[in-house]
């Protein structure tokens, strides 16, 4: 019988994932009992145990239930204190045609840093421009879980990375986002999770001027101190907003959100 470490959550928990994608991953496996756990798409907070059977993939809902003062995980008529105990139980008991044997193999996806990211939260994974990371999970649109070459795992902001392949070198790193002057194409990040998850519209102050390409009529011209009304934060790093009555896009590296109206300039415009 195959064995696996139930305490290694990253090996079996695939995070947000569609039923179709889970089926595709498991149907590429040849043996019964290969499985993964994903988030439920219909009930927030619940999970789905997806298992490769003989000729199909079965999906078993795992309900996260509050019982008195504790949380239990219920699958069918069985309840468990946590997910590792649930998985251990089904390595010894059949679900339909098979017990659990091992987690599904992940598609190895690598990314490379476009900027330095120093991180601001305990869960962040700092990295440098040009550093290669392996994606563990795509938790949110703008924040993913990744692992570095030392094996450390943490959260990274999607706008700071791009897809990587083994043939890339530093010259292939996207240079569409201008760097801070004098920093050798390295952007010292103070980006916070709240920046990318901020309720929009929100206001941001320009911290680096920018003169856009004359042929790009949708790009905003930025002057230090300008206040932009940010209307959209795209994962490619080109945000959208309104400045001086014009709507357009601008690189997120050139602005920082403001949290109050205590500004010597433009305060009457944004309060």
Swiss-Prot record:
GO terms for cellular component: cytoplasm. Belongs to the CRK family. Adapter protein which interacts with C-terminal portion of mbc, homolog of human DOCK180. May play a role in cellular processes throughout development. Coiled coil: none annotated. One of its GO terms (biological process) is positive regulation of JNK cascade. Keywords: Developmental protein, Repeat, SH2 domain, SH3 domain. Residues 106-166, 199-260 form the SH3 domain. SMART domains: SH2 (SM00252), SH3 (SM00326). The gene is Crk. It comes from Drosophila melanogaster. Residues 12-104 form the SH2 domain. Disulfide bonds: none annotated. The keyword rRNA-binding does not apply. Embryonic zygotic expression is seen in invaginating presumptive mesoderm and ectodermally derived tissues during gastrulation. At stage 8, expression is also seen in anterior and posterior midgut and cephalic furrow. By stage 9, expression is highest in visceral mesoderm of anterior and posterior midgut, ventral nerve cord and somatic mesoderm. Pfam families: SH2 (PF00017), SH3_1 (PF00018), SH3_2 (PF07653). GO terms for molecular function: receptor tyrosine kinase binding; signaling adaptor activity. This is Adapter molecule Crk.
